[in-house]
Amino acid sequence: MAEHQVPRPQKPPRRDVHGVLLLDKPIGWSSNDALIRAKRLLWAKKAGHTGTLDPLATGLLPLCFGEATKFSQDLLDADKTYETVVRLGIRTSTADAEGEVLSERPVSVTPEQLQAAIARFVGEIDQVPPMHSALKKDGKPLYEYARAGQTVERAARRVTIYAIDVLATDLQSAEPTVTLRVSCSKGTYIRTLGEDIGEALGCGGHLVALRRTQVGNLTLDGAVTLEALDAAAEDARGALLAPVDALLQTLPRVELDAQESRRFLHGQRLPLQLALPNADQVRVYGVRDAIAADATASLLGVAAWQGGVLRPERLVHL
């Protein structure tokens, strides 16, 4: 008698998902692992993150799905804001709490000395990338050299620190710390900054907490945890995504009529009479189907604006 086989449950097919998940990444997760988990929960065909956030760090990790991936580079280039806790008096091999202790020094720091040290790092500064970073040297991430006990030459990189605000201090305790908010350009290493501030104070330091609170114009307001995404009903998870144009809110908005929309979607340049002073790029909205019952304006893409001419750059197909 043939053995009865129970059919395996069918997995839902991958589907077109378009939008941005403002993920509040938990500690201990790599950015790629968080992306893979979210992609699986949404059954999305296409996804990408907008720059790595260390496993040690928590906070805002925008994940782009579908057509939103066309604009992920804009967030890679965007300014960032972090909140971090620096433990003074101890220097480690990784500039964070996961490394080996390299040195311990007494801490004798006044609030005035702290402010003076911090002020030295506001503005354009040169940073040497840490060995424990994902930056590549000869095609290999620096952290792989570090794990093998090797140190390689790294060129200093110019970054901009827009502001450093002191949120809290605990300078007199047995484990002195300072909590900072840092607004900075892309490519800034907060671990290196914390270590350098410690050296400027004469006692050394390392990060014990790091949280990203802003990327470009995106903040933690409305951010979603992996737990919340997992707990949501499968057919309700898509509603947790922000629309594609959440990535484009800093660009001026241009609306086209049905004929202009059709030409734009065919990649044609459009001479227009528009008052757009100081704008060189715009987000474009228009009608995709003029004969549809609901012919409302939707995002068509991003265009260059120069000399009164709209030139399509990145088209969106929703």
From Swiss-Prot:
Keywords: Isomerase, tRNA processing
Entry's EC annotation: 5.4.99.25
Top-level enzyme category: isomerase
GO molecular function, one term: RNA binding
Coiled-coil region list: none
Function comment: Responsible for synthesis of pseudouridine from uracil-55 in the psi GC loop of transfer RNAs.
Name assigned to this protein: tRNA pseudouridine synthase B
InterPro entries: PsdUridine_synth_cat_dom_sf, PsdUridine_synth_N, PUA-like_sf, tRNA_psdUridine_synth_TruB, tRNA_sdUridine_synth_fam1_C, TruB_C
The keyword Isomerase appears for this protein: yes
Any matching Pfam family: TruB_C_2
Catalytic residues (UniProt): D54
Disulphide-bonded residues: none
Family membership noted in the UniProt record: Belongs to the pseudouridine synthase TruB family. Type 1 subfamily.
Lineage, uppermost ranks: Bacteria, Pseudomonadati, Pseudomonadota, Betaproteobacteria, Burkholderiales
Known catalytic reactions: uridine(55) in tRNA = pseudouridine(55) in tRNA
Keyword Acyltransferase among UniProt keywords: no
GO BP, one annotated term: mRNA pseudouridine synthesis
Superkingdom of source: Bacteria
